[in-house]
Swiss-Prot record:
One of its GO terms (molecular function) is hormone activity. GO terms for biological process: Casparian strip assembly; regulation of root morphogenesis. Disruption phenotype: No detectable phenotype in cif1-1. The double mutant cif1-1 cif2-1 is defective in ion homeostasis in the xylem due to defect in endodermal barrier formation in the roots. Highly sensitive to excess iron. Retarded growth under low-potassium conditions. Repeatedly interrupted, discontinuous Casparian strip due to patch-like localization of the CASPs proteins. Reduced rosette leaf size. GO terms for cellular component: Casparian strip. It comes from Arabidopsis thaliana (Mouse-ear cress). Peptide hormone required for contiguous Casparian strip diffusion barrier formation in roots via the regulation of CASPs protein expression and distribution in a GSO1-GSO2 signaling pathway. The Casparian strip is required for ion homeostasis (e.g. iron and potassium ions). Residues 1-22 form the signal peptide. The modification Hydroxyproline is found at P69, P71. Expressed exclusively in the root stele. Induction: Induced by excess iron and further synergistically regulated by lowering the medium pH. Keywords: Cell wall biogenesis/degradation, Developmental protein, Hormone, Hydroxylation, Signal, Sulfation. This is Protein CASPARIAN STRIP INTEGRITY FACTOR 1.
Amino acid sequence: MGMSPLTVKKLGFIFMIVSASALSVSFAGRPSIFVHKKINLREEMVERSMHEHERLLRMNTKDYGNNSPSPRLERPPFKLIPN
């Protein structure tokens, strides 16, 4: 009672379709735990503003000291030379 190669291919294809659909259904479960996590907006805003303030302090060096390189090429601000 041997099975023909065509029957084996058909059964394999049907098994592949069923297993792929079962896998996709299993991934479509409930939302992630991060959706239900309560976010404290006040702490997040304070943290974000502290980060922005630090970034602005590093960026606003108007002298010829060490500063982070500018993303565009521009001349440094002119400093008067005392006579």
